[in-house]
Amino acid sequence: FDTATHKQQWLDLNNQVFAHHPDQGNWAMADLDNRIKEDWFDPQGFFLATEKGVIEGFVWTKIHQDLVNQDPVGELYVVGTAPAHHGRGIARALSVEAINYFVTKGLKHAMLYVDADNEKGLKLYQSLGFN
């Protein structure tokens, strides 16, 4: 993820993917910029699938290091695929890449949040070992 070149395109795709989701689907550039300024933001942990410069899917990670008496935990913070590219395994491939990123950072645990009615997401995450 390159903040100079990907921000607007990612924001547009995020808002499309999560149009139905009140917390995630109506972001303005200021929302994205605020998160990029957070101490936890790492562009190396923001994975994109692109074809000819167009973002087809993404996994944005977050590492929680401020946990009391616990090791840091990696979070699959936002996962999305452009509707035209559903079913191609993009979210799976990027999620695996993100989990491998956590391993390279020495993390032993990963987590995510998913809505209970997101059947495709639940199936994907369960197949990756989340429960």
What role is predicted for each listed range?
Residues 8-9, 47, 58-59, 90, ...:
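Ligand-binding pocket scaffold of soluble enzyme catalytic domains
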Residues 1-12:
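A short beta-loop-alpha structural element at the N-terminal edge
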Residues 86, 95-103:
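A conserved short alpha-helix in the GNAT/GCN5 acetyltransferase fold that borders
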Residues 77-86, 115:
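A short, internal acetyl-CoA/4′-phosphopantetheine-binding micro-motif in the GNAT/acyltransferase core
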Residues 102-113:
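Conserved GNAT acetyl-CoA-binding A-motif
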Residues 21-79:
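A conserved beta-strand-loop-helix scaffold within acyl/acetyltransferase catalytic domains
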Residues 88, 92, 116-131:
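Conserved active-site alpha-helix within GNAT-family acetyltransferase domains
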Residues 77-81, 99, 108:
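Helical hairpin unit composed of two closely spaced alpha helices linked by a short loop
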